[in-house]
Regions:
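Charge-biased low-complexity segments
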Residues: 1-206
């Protein structure tokens, strides 16, 4: 069977079983390795979850194993492998990233708005002040600031990778810091995670 076709069918089945059987996203592992044998009848047997691959460690939760086992058992039988005209068992190994599940990866939001970055840009546009002296001196361009949204919704500044003037950098960074605590953080598999943003702010005299 085509590996890509199988993966799509399997992901669809996993999603269906998750919804049907009431699995919660926070119970599941983000990434895991699955190994199974397709026997001569086309059934998936001897399902295993190796704990490493090329130095990468895996620690799948019990609920993740249960979900994948159920989904695998409900797939249509495979076409068995053949060698010299005879059916033979075939071992398949798959690295599974659960990002395809609903709610597996939820981007940060600002002040409860669905489009967090758009709401953040609107906030900046309302509060930006273009210093008159800099404007008259022809200082313009893009201030690009990097910052983290922490798991608790606070802000940690990294710095500015681009800026036409330190005063503009300071102004933008202050506005960003003022939003600390007003963010809902990135959620991966239901768990709050640190998230890096590189955000451009344009100062245009025209």
């Amino acid at each position: 069977d085509d590996p890509d076709v199988f993966r799509k069918q399997f992901e669809k089945k996993v999603t269906k079983v998750m919804k049907r059987d009431g699995y919660r996203i926070e119970e599941l592992s983000h990434e895991l390795l699955m190994k199974f044998t397709i026997d001569t009848l086309g059934r998936c047997v001897d399902v295993q979850y190796p704990d490493s691959l090329g130095g990468v460690r895996f620690n799948p939760t019990q609920r993740s194993r249960e979900l994948l086992n159920t989904a695998l058992s409900e797939l249509n039988p495979f076409t068995p492998a053949y060698k010299d005209g005879r059916k033979i068992p075939y071992v398949r190994k798959m690295l599974i990233n659960m990002n395809f599940l609903p709610g597996a990866f939820v981007k940060p939001t600002f002040r409860g708005k669905k489009d967090g970055l758009m709401a953040f840009r609107e906030y900046l546009n309302r509060n930006l002040v273009y210093d008159t002296k800099l404007y008259e001196a022809g200082v313009y361009g893009t201030v690009r600031v990097e910052f983290y949204i922490e798991p608790d919704g606070t802000i940690t500044l990294v710095g500015a990778s681009e800026s036409p003037h330190p005063a503009l950098t300071e102004h933008v960074q202050k506005l960003i810091l003022d939003t600390s605590g007003q963010w809902t953080p990135l959620l991966e598999m239901g768990h709050p995670c640190r998230y890096l943003i590189s955000f451009p702010v344009n100062f245009d005299p025209g």
